[in-house]
């Protein structure tokens, strides 16, 4: 299995995509809203992807909930992470967060999708890129909700990806559009943003981590996604993380400071990423495949889903029906809360 995760253009594979998926450096594929028409079409697309590749790929999606939910029609409307904090009863909030993790994972596994890149572990809501995707502005409250969500995902048979290490929540800039700079002292980042990562790693609840395309100026001139200081010295050595490290999408403007697409890919792997994402730019992806040093990433097989869900049986189950009803209601209440200002 190779270390590159790519995307495809539409509802089904074209001839060029079938050839690209056979490339030995390709190990994963991420799906977007443009790949989704309905559940039957999505299941067929995943079947085509599986058939086209020589080795089983890691098939991924961003199905966090709220504004980052690629598949909507026919799937449960998942609430924003921040909405759990608006529930007055702590036990109810914890149960709903766990239900959300389980239901999201079960619905994706029923499509033969291995992972959703979740949960978001950034602290606070000031960042344009994060906002309501964050569970809470208080690290301990965010930790409680994230742990519940993670346990739900694991109970369904899906691995977790904590993002965006060491924390994207304090910068207002959007790394999709520019390279944000976090000028805070390292001590503040450690005691505020990194607490949730440190605790979840210590509890062995994170299977993968995705670093931020953010420059932390007190630590390194490179974004964390291309920084051996953050990925090796801090994440691997200090925190003892032994899971998978993904880059965020290298087509984002936050990664452009690392050079051409090929240079971004090589820099991220050299810094310590196990798999790099190159999306929304076919020419850039081909450049990465043409220029990247040959490398295997067979450790990524640990990310395959271990659950089994038939879609019709899942949706007929009392657990799904109860969770679907409660989470849909929470989404609607949160929307009403926002509309009132």
From Swiss-Prot:
Keywords, in A-Z order: Cell cycle, Cell division, Cell shape, Cell wall biogenesis/degradation, Cytoplasm, Glycosidase, Hydrolase, Peptidoglycan synthesis
Site-annotated residues for Important for catalytic activity: 174
Pfam family name, one: Glyco_hydro_3
Highest taxon listed in the record's lineage: Bacteria
Reaction equation(s) it catalyzes: Hydrolysis of terminal non-reducing N-acetyl-D-hexosamine residues in N-acetyl-beta-D-hexosaminides
GO biological process: carbohydrate metabolic process; cell division; cell wall organization; peptidoglycan biosynthetic process; peptidoglycan turnover; regulation of cell shape
Stored Gene3D superfamilies: Glycoside hydrolase, family 3, N-terminal domain
Membership in a protein family: Belongs to the glycosyl hydrolase 3 family. NagZ subfamily.
Function: Plays a role in peptidoglycan recycling by cleaving the terminal beta-1,4-linked N-acetylglucosamine (GlcNAc) from peptide-linked peptidoglycan fragments, giving rise to free GlcNAc, anhydro-N-acetylmuramic acid and anhydro-N-acetylmuramic acid-linked peptides.
UniProt protein name: Beta-hexosaminidase
Species, as recorded: Yersinia enterocolitica serotype O:8 / biotype 1B (strain NCTC 13174 / 8081)
Encoding gene (name): nagZ
